[in-house]
């Protein structure tokens, strides 16, 4: 905690004010990624018990993975590394197909983990790959001028993921923090989108 806090403090002191959105995007992505990894570890260890906990773990990992990869794309765009909006042919169909596939695989993980021991590792890997690709594909077509709104939405996603993982771990602090971040990110997104 001290090492991570020290790095974050140092980065916050040296980053230019004009580069603050990029820093927020990266920090937000790390939060979403951490929430997703917590779920992966809990599934791999066989520590997810009951359909409600398994469902929340899958939802948290899906939302956290989307927030992670989407935040990385947002950072790359704001930093000028990824200059053009990338749009796939039939983008909406691809988004829907990836979303349905990730949700379907998540449902399979939930049903295979409840009462059957740890979920198969390959199912988890495939699920995370789908979720990460979904986050990148959803964020790639959006232009740089709209990235602050996207970052705010992804921030709300990270809050939801953290809240779900707090329930999975039985940690009220994570649940409360996730609810606060999710609600404030949603409110900020609505205000910025007007």
Regions found by a protein language model. Give the residues of each.
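Glycine-rich phosphate/diphosphate-binding loop of Rossmann-like nucleotide-binding domains
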Residues: 77-98, 109, 115-117
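Cytoplasmic-side transmembrane-helix entry/capping segments in multi-pass membrane proteins
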Residues: 19-31, 85-97, 147-156
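Transmembrane alpha-helix boundary signature
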Residues: 10-20, 36-51, 73, 112-116
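Helical transmembrane-bundle signal
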Residues: 32-38, 42, 64-77, 99-109, ...
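Alpha-helical transmembrane segments in multi-pass membrane proteins
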Residues: 3-4, 8, 12, 31-34, ...
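Loop-to-transmembrane alpha-helix initiation sites
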Residues: 51-62, 123-127, 169-184
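Transmembrane helix-loop junctions at the membrane interface of multipass transporters and ion channels
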Residues: 41-49, 111-118, 144, 149, ...
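C-terminal ends of transmembrane helices
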Residues: 5-24, 71-85, 134-147, 189-193
């Amino acid at each position: 905690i001290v090492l991570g806090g020290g790095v974050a403090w140092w980065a916050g002191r040296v980053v230019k004010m004009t580069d603050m959105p990029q820093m927020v995007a990266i920090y937000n992505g790390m939060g979403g990624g951490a929430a997703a990894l917590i779920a992966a570890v809990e599934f791999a260890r066989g520590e997810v018990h009951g359909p409600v906990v398994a469902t929340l773990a899958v939802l948290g990992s899906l939302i956290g993975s989307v927030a992670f990869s989407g935040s990385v794309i947002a950072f790359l765009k704001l930093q000028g590394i990824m200059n053009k909006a990338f749009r796939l042919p039939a983008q909406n169909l691809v988004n829907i197909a990836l979303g349905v596939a990730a949700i379907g695989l998540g449902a399979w993980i939930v049903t295979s983990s409840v009462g059957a021991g740890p979920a198969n590792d390959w199912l988890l890997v495939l699920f995370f790959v789908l979720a990460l690709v979904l986050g990148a594909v959803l964020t790639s077509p959006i232009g740089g001028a709209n990235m602050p709104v996207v970052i705010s939405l992804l921030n709300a996603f990270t809050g939801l993921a953290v809240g779900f993982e707090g329930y999975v771990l039985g940690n009220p602090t994570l649940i409360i923090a996730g609810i606060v971040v999710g609600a404030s990110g949603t409110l900020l997104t609505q205000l910025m989108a007007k």
